[in-house]
Design a protein with these regions (language model features):
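A generic structural motif
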Residues: 30-35, 134-135
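Secondary-structure boundary/capping motif
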Residues: 14-17, 45, 80-81, 117-118
Length: 185
């Protein structure tokens, strides 16, 4: 059955490696629908704004509700989660009784020119998501190191065939995970 997958890129940079990886997901699988969920225009989280929620936040939350699952594709900054992504997750967690990510299936992918493939950031993101009662794809980690050697930076496309295969396998596992989430609730 066709699934609707939301893609959240944890980088604001227009041509970020992670945005290129996210775009490649849409090209590697045409049997599912992919929807970009942008976090660029979200204001900094502030509980005072919950009285009159900004339209950008309302649209962001609605986009999350409208998909079957979310894949977060994020870089790692200073061995941690990018601030813009943490801000988006904070908005998605509030108010707690109607948190849009609660019980939603989420997968994590990260790409970096370094050698550890966003391992530290993914640990932190996973910790935040688990505190939000999100169903994070267990066991499967998609850590893409040396990403600058795996893409064509002029064409803005993933060229490494092994990484493409890994992404296809990861996506297959994620879709399978979505199908089994109801059994967990």
């Amino acid at each position: 059955m066709t699934k609707s997958i939301g893609l959240i890129c944890g980088s604001l940079r227009k041509n970020s490696y992670n945005r290129i990886i996210a775009q490649s997901l849409t090209e590697l699988d045409d049997s599912h629908q992919f929807r970009w969920i942008e976090i660029n225009d979200l204001p900094l989280f502030n509980e005072d704004l919950e009285i009159s929620v900004p339209e950008t936040v309302t649209s962001f939350k609605s986009a999350i509700q409208d998909v079957d699952g979310i894949i977060i594709i994020s870089p790692e900054y200073n061995s941690g989660i990018p601030g813009v992504l943490k801000n988006a997750l904070d908005w998605a967690s509030r108010p707690r009784e109607s948190a849009v990510l609660s019980r939603k299936p989420v997968g994590l992918i990260g790409a970096t020119p370094g050698g550890l493939g966003t391992a530290f950031a993914q640990l932190q993101i996973r910790q935040v998501l688990e505190a939000m009662q999100v169903h994070v794809l267990p066991f499967q980690k998609m850590l893409i190191s040396q990403v600058h050697k795996k893409i064509d930076s002029e064409q803005k496309v993933l060229t490494d065939e092994q990484t493409k295969r890994y992404l296809q396998q990861y996506l297959h596992q994620f879709i399978h995970w979505i199908d089994h989430i109801p059994a967990l609730d």
